């Protein structure tokens, strides 16, 4: 999954949140948390105070590392950071990719879908993270899944639940009282984990932010379908041609929101056709597209379904082309784990370690993928959130409209099905124009859904708009509750107030 350096404007909120923090005075001895038998099925490996750092703005906190073993063979590592100045809440954080990386603290190290704990700590949250039940060098490594059903279950849902249950116990033991509210926030795989919490473990959290969630194996099947599209004879297109397509799309559709700013606000309203770039007879260079290339780009935009209506691939959005690589390999070359090479999860998805994803046929195999044992553990597709919602839980979904990995339309589909099943009082979906996977892109990608979630859960103020920024571009945009999107009205185009949600 894509690693982004942008997501939330945490720093500007630190001062405000510090004022709200409940100063608990002299906290219990951090090392006391290592006492044997204090927590069931758990070995607390370390517990030590980390001093405040004036340079980074990090507060002093107690850092606890624990090994959780709920079943035989399970090895879930979790880390908890308990600030001296606590705001009375706990914040669960999810992983990215295939997880396996745990000790994420500073935003400069890794951010976006693998959001570090430091933003929550600076706001006074006790934070919780897990490696998902296994250790990896890279989040794209899925080798740990080989003949390891316990680890697969841990990664799919058990690890994040066990992390949360123990986290509540650690918080109560350290501070002498339970957290008043428990929130969760993550993107990508972490978004899926958050959705899984609302579906399987509805008592864990009071509110969940799930960004660009990889909640279905559609992400994997789509990567194969897209690879097949551009691996067809004569279909591959160069980086220069991708830029040509992108620039032409912007020329046709950028201004439909009232402002030319390099972003197609609503890709559904963009009716540009690739055939307009087809080369004249006898011409074949980067200034145009051959018929085979036109066909490939057309297919990339199209949602593909089986005859019975099962989606095998949601189309890429017009305007997202500049962000296709590395998730969509349009040029000749080997596959990788992001764009069609399923590697170690082939036997989990297809039941055959020798299956060649290049031969994948949506009509023959798509429905079967969702019936596998792996899908039953991994997919967070249930819309029965009655237990979560009935206890006051709130779900805030968001997705970048230019995301070339998990499709924003998949998240929209889940949102609409959830509203149909439960009503729309306790769920919101926010689409971010021009934003890639969990961040990046020409759109405004840095915003604060956690504060909106807090206000919703604690004060009943359902979010309708937020403000997002793109610091590099120096712009602000409203983030609008679906089905609304931001349209330019008048005034300074760099300010959110110059736009209206409609």
Regions found by a protein language model. Name each.
Residues 2-11:
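Bacterial N-terminal signal peptides that target proteins for export
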Residues 11-20:
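Bacterial N-terminal signal peptides
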Residues 23-89, 101-107, 114-115, 246, ...:
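Catalytic-loop region of hydrolases
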Residues 97-176, 222-223, 230, 354-377, ...:
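Cap/lid segment of the alpha/beta-hydrolase catalytic domain
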Residues 186-190, 194:
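Gly/Ala-rich beta-loop-alpha elbow adjacent to hydrolase catalytic centers
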Residues 196-198, 203-305, 431, 451:
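A catalytic-pocket lid/entrance helix-loop region that shapes and gates access to the active site
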Residues 397-399:
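Short beta-strand/loop motif that positions the catalytic acidic residue
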Residues 405-409:
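Conserved alpha/beta-hydrolase "acid-adjacent" motif
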